[in-house]
Amino acid sequence: MNNIRKTHPLMKIVNSSFIDLPAPSNISSWWNFGSLLGICLIAQILTGLFLAMHYTSDTMTAFSSVTHICRDVNYGWLIRYLHANGASMFFICLFLHVGRGLYYGSYMYLETWNIGVLLLFAVMATAFMGYVLPWGQMSFWGATVITNLLSAIPYIGTNLVEWIWGGFSVDKATLTRFFAFHFILPFIVAALAGVHLLFLHETGSNNPSGLNSDTDKIPFHPYYTIKDILGALIMITALTSLVLFSPDMLGDPDNYIPANPLNTPPHIKPEWYFLFAYAILRSIPNKLGGVLALVLSIAILTIIPLLHTAKQRSMMFRPMSQCLFWILVADLLTLTWIGGQPVEHPFVVIGQLASVIYFMLILLIMPITSMIENQLLKW
């Protein structure tokens, strides 16, 4: 009798994806983040589902319904903070996952990479709309500022913004549709993640050396299942520690003030994971220019495979490129810091410099350095 795991139509998909999958023998802990992102997504969908059972998407009751969840629902506070901080864990894993892809040249798998960029956009959209739902001051003003950016689009801008708002300002219609989109998008993300995996399994995983690993493969289970479980336990420990000890550390205190269209907060800023893009947006004095830079700061990832000039895939044996990669990481951390600062001297200048360095590194300095390294290989 054949093993049901290998014959059953559904089981054999699971088997070929998570059990008998041939994996390179040398992939490091940087390859753990795919599974961690899957765990994050499942956790977000589950906690979100339970929150949606008690949440009301009406401007009059949204804020108090979130308060009700925290005070009156059994373990409502836990579900709410797991969901809010789960988003932060999601983005930490996302950024590390993308960073891994950049460092080890995983972007050479074009379909997998481009679907990944699409996933990044989808998760960012989901997180933005989720931030609007508690209807606090930062929710309202964040929604107003970010949706208003679309008015920079020539000719159709103003009509587009009013169409998204469902009126002449951010109001009940906006909140209701944002809730609807926030509910449906994670399922679209899950479907995209399935396609992401499908394309990845067409080629097999990359590995730290960037070399073909067909000659040395090991089964995914038990080697990488146990490794992924360890990674998951570390992440879950970090998340529960954050939720139980300082759940509001990453949030904005202004969001505990109910939304008031007549009173603008002194510093409007998004959640920490959007600050780098927000800093790039603010560093350009022109509205349309800022919006384009904001979109390009993420969309630039799609052209990274075209900018790969090195003869080696991975940065493992390219010390000059490694150095530039870590400069890029430092630059993104600088942008994140600047995004949370007020618009005044010297933060404006630092933000502008960091933005220029960001685009220069990716578009010019890194490809040229790779070409220099190619020449050094001949020595």
Curated annotation (Swiss-Prot):
Binding locations of heme b b562: 83, 182
Cofactor: heme b
Protein's UniProt keywords contain Iron: yes
Pfam families from the UniProt entry: Cytochrom_B_C (PF00032), Cytochrome_B (PF00033)
Alphabetical list of InterPro entries matching this protein: Cyt_b/b6_C, Cyt_b/b6_C_sf, Cyt_b/b6_N, Cytb/b6-like_sf, Cytochrome_b, Cytochrome_b_C_euk/bac, Cytochrome_b_N_euk/bac, Di-haem_cyt_TM
More details: Heme 1 (or BL or b562) is low-potential and absorbs at about 562 nm, and heme 2 (or BH or b566) is high-potential and absorbs at about 566 nm.
Protein name stated in the entry: Cytochrome b
Organism: Crocidura attenuata (Asian gray shrew)
Gene name linked to the record: MT-CYB
